[in-house]
Design a protein with these regions (language model features):
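Flexible, gly/proline-biased loop segments at the beginnings
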Residues: 1-139
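Intrinsically disordered, low-complexity linker/loop segments enriched in Gly/Pro
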Residues: 149-154
Length: 154
């Protein structure tokens, strides 16, 4: 990027100046995990922009607020009070989901079923920056996902 010294401006490169890696760049050495960015650090880059840029944060928060709106409602408000054993309400979980959707374009939830598997007992938000997809199989199906807070450190 070319810098102009007088006002410390940066010129944004043209569309064609960007490097677009091939698909092999996004697989680990075993070929199972699809990387999120060339160094597998794209989510941390997005979070850094969100935390360091008030304009970026304002835009992301506006999208989040548009998704959340007035929050979740139901005729029996007590249903919304507890989503999991950590004491989070459904609206707490929904706000986290909306922020991940605004930042990353996706979200993840951990759903805990009862022992007899007849009802959902807990729902937890999973930080989307901790999630990576397994490589697609030959039929184009993603067989699973990996969750780790250490992805950007590898």
């Amino acid at each position: 990027m070319k810098e102009l010294n007088k006002h410390r401006l940066t010129i944004i490169p043209k569309y064609g100046d960007y490097y677009y890696p091939d698909s092999k760049t996004f697989e680990d050495d075993k070929g199972k995990i699809v990387y999120y960015g060339q160094q597998n650090d794209f989510p941390s880059s997005i979070i850094e922009l969100y935390n360091k840029s008030s304009i970026n944060a304002t835009c992301v928060n506006a999208i989040r607020d548009g998704i959340v709106g007035g929050g979740l409602t139901t005729q029996n408000e007590e249903v919304l009070n507890i989503a999991n054993r950590d004491g989070e309400s459904w609206n707490d979980v929904f706000k986290k989901v909306a922020l991940d959707r605004s930042l990353f374009g996706g979200f993840a939830l951990e759903v805990i079923w009862s022992k007899d598997r007849t009802k959902v007992t807990d729902v937890y938000h999973i930080d989307f920056s901790y999630l990576r997809a397994h490589r697609m199989n030959e039929r184009g199906i993603i067989p699973g996902y990996y969750v780790s807070s250490e992805f950007q450190n590898k």
